[in-house]
Amino acid sequence: MKTQSIVRDFPIVCVGGSAGGLDSYIRLLQNLPDDLGAAIVIVNHLRTVATLLHEILPRHTKMPVELITEKLDIEPNHVFIIPEKRDLHVLNREFRLKPISKPRGWPDVITVFMRSLTENWDGKLISVIVSGYDGDGAAALCGIKEVGGITIAQKPDTASHPDMPESAIASGCIDFVLSPEDIAREIKRIVLAI
């Protein structure tokens, strides 16, 4: 058990977004170092954009960008993208995919993934909510804080669709409210302090 904890000691940064999230992801990645020492997982609940992110985002970071597949190893200094119509979980340092649990209405893939992290990841957790409709992710933020994680919302006036950041802020469980550029700086500060 001790060996697994040492292996999984690096942080995971979950970045959840939807409509308008692409701009936020780009601004964030452009300001993160390539040797950050954390895994970046982008959980976008807008299905059509999610499938294209692994093609678009490599233009904005030198970190490898991968579309998540079943049992893909989680590695630091990589950007991972959730595939469409899937719930994402972690288990034994791997990603696990399941059929989406909420196929109608607004999906809750961000909430599902963050809850899995709180139960199955030993390293530091940093959860970021950026531009998007609805309130996906907000319900899991207090759980992230309960396990010692850090929560960040995009400053609503810097988001093209502020619903998701506003819902996150309304949860009462947000540590920082920042622009994407400042989110990147804060993530770097947190990871370096670990």
Placement of each model-derived feature along the sequence:
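Strand-loop microenvironment adjacent to phosphate/nucleotide-handling motifs in alpha/beta enzyme folds
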Residues: 1-194
